[in-house]
Amino acid sequence: MIEAGHNMKDRILFEEIPHGTEYLQTVIDAMLQSKELEVDYQSYYGHRATYHMHPYAMKVYNQRWYVVGYIREKEGIRNIALDRTLELTIGTETFVLPDDFDAEEYYANTVGIFVNENQKPQKVVVRAFGKQVEYMRSLPLHHTQEEIKTVHEEYIDFRYKLCLTPELSTHLLAMGEKVKVLEPEELRSEIKNRLLATIQNYE
């Protein structure tokens, strides 16, 4: 299929990933060789640091490349965004990929890229209205999505089992008035407070 579409590149469009792609081959080489990466990194908040990372896996999310792996300085598994990387080189230290690490399982309980290993997944219930129902049926918010209540031509309640993360809140906020969080109260309050803060920006 790829070869068949080679001459149609002006008609088959993919989302552009603006930054970070220049490091992809280096990361892949480090993963293949089981070599540590030395990363000169600047966070979105401006903090700059050098990290030594065992690259376990890679993931694209929201037009950004991320590398997940063990960071020595953090003493745990973390993500780094390649578009925040200032310099990246392969070191001499080798590592062994843990037998119990599975990239899909690592992200299984979250929406997006953020993982808090101390957080347990919990029940989340979201009510969708109107056309948003079919949209969420065709593109579930999370793989645990279940329909638990249907009121014909009015709304459907979807249930999930996942961790509460900033990205989950962002996804729900992006749906605007087409959804309503029913449970848990913690998430419901957060969404409400962020909507009120948004309204204040327009006053």
Feature map (PLM): residue ranges:
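Loop-centered beta-sheet repeat module
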Residues: I28-I71, R78
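Short beta-strand segments
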Residues: A49-Y51, G76-I80, V124, I156
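Bulky hydrophobic/aromatic content
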Residues: M1-Q42
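Polybasic (Lys/Arg-rich)
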Residues: A108-E203
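Flexible linker/loop signature enriched in Pro/Ser/Thr and Pro/Gly
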Residues: K74-Y106
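Short, charged/polar surface micro-motifs in flexible loops or helix N-caps
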Residues: Y61-W65, R72-K74, G91-F95, G130-E134
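A structural signal for short hydrophobic beta-strand segments in well-ordered beta-sheet cores
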Residues: M58, L88, I148-K149
